[in-house]
Amino acid sequence: MLRFIAVLILIAVSTPALAETLRVPQGHRTIQAAVDAAQPGDTVLVSAGTYKERIQLKPGIVVRSAGDKTVGKKGLKRAETVILDGGGKNGKKPGVLMAKGSTLDGFTITNVGVYDEAIWKKHFDSQGEELGDDEGSVQAEGTIPAVSIQAVNCTVTNNIVHHNGDVGIAIVGSKDQRVTPLIANNVSFRNLGGGVGIADLAEPIVRDNACSENLRAGIGCRNSSPFIFDNTCFNNVRAGIGCREGARPIIRGNKCYQNRRAGIGVRMKGTAPVVENNECYENDMAGIGNRDDAEPIIRNNKCYKNKMAGIGSDGSKPLIVGNECRENLMAGIGLRGKAEATIQKNKCVENKLVAIGVTQGSTATITENELVRTGGVPPIIAVKDGSTASFDNNDVKGGGVAAMLVQGTATISGNRFTGMGEKQGNAVWVWKGSKATIANNDFVGYRAAVNASESELVVMGNTIREFRGQAIVVKDSSKPAHVFGNTAISKDEKAVVVAIQGTKGVVADNVVKHQGEDGGEE
């Protein structure tokens, strides 16, 4: 008997207390009162109503709205009917302060701080041009988030966070430990800061959130390494997703559209995100923009119908691979400000200006891209303002005054240029003071394959078809022009391979092959 009693005592001591459910307002008048009474593992279940309080969670507890998975107008219906009202004053406390291992599930959090519609509209109208660099940013002086995660691992899910005076959901990391909270399935809009803000070495998983009409980015990260997956960010005053100050996020599978600036914006030295498989469209600036010495990897994204470039780089060092840029109102891919880029295996189709523009002293290695535009005056590829480009093994279809314009230095080799229509201009137009080596390309359907004046030129080993009159035209070269080993194929018996005015270098082994009516060479 004594042994049996001893066993029962041992079981009682070793078995943890069963988790309890504390109900608000049935058992506790306020959410905070229920939280204070809860133990790790307990759930605070909150019924529909408006609760005018700001709360601080305890480790290991779940605070959840009562209800099921029924969807309402903005999010879950239960989140729409259980409202945490911060009182509309600035104060010193966030709307919700998360704790280690805690969960916040299914609330509307609003009125934390002072939301000013006039301030929001002013910055929306100016595209955030007058917005201070830290205004509304996580960890800026005086930041009071609606939901604050201070160097703890926790879960924030199914919430609606809106009309707050600062950032919606803020995550701050620590140099002493990994901070990897889960931020999922939330709706964050009309906050006077970012929708979700991440700073100071935090590494959260941010997925399946909808962030719109926030004063800064829908999702912003600085000096952090979050995983930003499958979110929808639209109509934000700045970028849909923004990263800066050495951030190294993975940004994957997001939709960013109709933002007042870029769909995804990357800036500052040391900032090196992987930006992949996103869809960025109808943004007021670039689909994906990067600048100021940032070093992003930009791959397999779709960028279309943006008001500036599909992908725009200003003074940065991107790797741009496998993207599709369509119908943007400026360039498909644009470089300026001494940018240095590798541009490989992209598809740029029907962009209003150039498919690829390399300007303002930039440098680019451009390989294995498909570049298409029907109609329009601008060239498909422009190397301008003393820029440098290596252009190899690309497929180019169409063009305006030229398929490719060179006002700088370019090596053009192994490409396939195909004109579209009888009024097609030159394939490669080399401007005064430029330097070009044009080798082993296939040109079909342009007025001339090469038209160069007052430049330094080497043209060799090219095949030229369906040109008009003169295949290669060189005028007044700054140094002797070398043109050799080129083959022109034409039905015109008067066709000429090379026409040079001015100083000649090596001009040899250029051949015209006359084409019969049946298309065969004679």
Show where each model-derived region lies.
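Extracellular beta-strand solenoid repeats
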Residues: 45, 56, 64, 85, ...
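All-beta strand scaffolds that present successive hydrophobic residues in beta-strands
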Residues: 63-64, 103-106, 126-131, 154-157, ...
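Acidic Gly/Asp/Thr-rich repetitive segments characteristic of extracellular carbohydrate-active
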Residues: 20-52
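Short glycine/acidic-rich loop motifs that flank beta-strands on beta-rich extracellular proteins
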Residues: 51-57, 87-95, 113-120, 143-145, ...
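Right-handed parallel beta-helix
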Residues: 103-215, 220-223
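Right-handed parallel beta-helix/beta-spiral solenoid domain characteristic of secreted/periplasmic
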Residues: 20, 26, 61-138, 521-522
